[in-house]
Amino acid sequence: IIMCLLSDAAVMSVWPTMKPFLTPGKALYFSHGFAITWSDRTGVVPPTDIDVIMVAPKGSGTSLRTMFLEGRGLNSSYAIYQDATGKALDRTLAFGIGIGSGYLFETTFQREATSNLTGERGSLMGAIQGLLLAQYEVLRENGHTPSEAFNETVEELTQSLMPLFAKNGMDWMYANCSTTAQRGALDWMTPFHDAIKPVVQKLYQSVKSGNEAQISIDSNSKPDYREKLNEELKALRESEMWQTAVTVRKLRPENN
């Protein structure tokens, strides 16, 4: 079994070296469906006489490793792209159990890759930064201090509310907050939904068409990609909102 756990860009660069070792009866294991789903763009086309399988943990590699060492695990999706040996399912589930998956749900390489890229650009990372920044900016533009704007936008969300609705659901959250917050949340969730859904639809179509994959391939293949990435991350890190975060984190009770 050959495990391909490299970044999407790296898979493309090492594929010519890897492919000769994929002899009949072996298995090629992925943790993400990108390379196979957009094989017309990545050039990753496995031989037909091997198993091609995937277990995709629903979280970061850092979280997966930390939880594994603690005897816990992330939930994972799994998929079989090719079953040349008749053992692909057994191999896949064994790996899923071996990495400590809380539970395993079946998918396809295409569905995993499409939902993953949508999530990363949407609610998991891209959209959440956009939403937080928009609210922070409006509060600051209306005279609120950096500390107040950050606490009401980010700190309360991440330190207090997220753990609660992660454990109990959003209905529980709404049932266990102040009546003022409850009424406002119920009234405003629909305008936010209606404003955001067209953006998510546009994003999904960009992912499904392969456009997002191509953007990723093109940008990651540039020789100065890392340099430009560091510049973008530096700008984010040095923005007022995230500089305020540094101060606020230092003031948490556990840090004093």
Short names for language-model regions:
Residues 6, 10, 84, 127, ...:
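Catalytic cores of large soluble enzymes that bind and process phosphate-bearing ligands
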Residues 29-121:
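Rossmann-fold dinucleotide-binding core
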